[in-house]
């Protein structure tokens, strides 16, 4: 099986994005699955277009999107994506939508189709702080998860899609007051998530 793992480009003045730093360090195979890693632009329109191109070309069995959640103190496994773009800051293309749908006429929300609770349980068993999250926000992270789930519902019903938010890296918290997580633990968390997804696909 093939699992597409995506991370984002830096945004909001940051020089790095831990989602891609962790994703790109994943092995090429895990749990019998091939991991294909791609960096996605932190832009509302371009992120969905990039994902569409990857799904068309690669035809993966599962998609695990990864994003940065500044201020988080653990791995957040997202359960739902909502059909809303409402940006506090502009994306990397300068776009800052307010109260816009991700997909005009699309459903209000989609639930993630990867085994979210099982991933959280597996992470905690390894001593990695993790929780289920019921809001992926209204920025590009939620946008990408909604696009993935919408495209799955429309064209690839067997495709499993989900999203994991990671905290800041220590070097991003200059004053030391914001929560952070080491890169090694983030990579281990993504490896574990991929293993759980691969195991479910075998069943």
Q: What is the role of each PLM region?
A:
Residues 1-136, 149-158, 178-203:
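N-terminal catalytic or cofactor-binding beta/alpha core of small enzyme domains
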Residues 13, 141, 169-176:
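Short active-site-adjacent structural elements
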Residues 58, 139, 145-146, 163:
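Broad hydrophobic/π-residue packing in well-ordered secondary structure
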Residues 124, 143, 159-161, 166-171:
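C-terminal folded domains that constitute the principal catalytic or ligand-binding module
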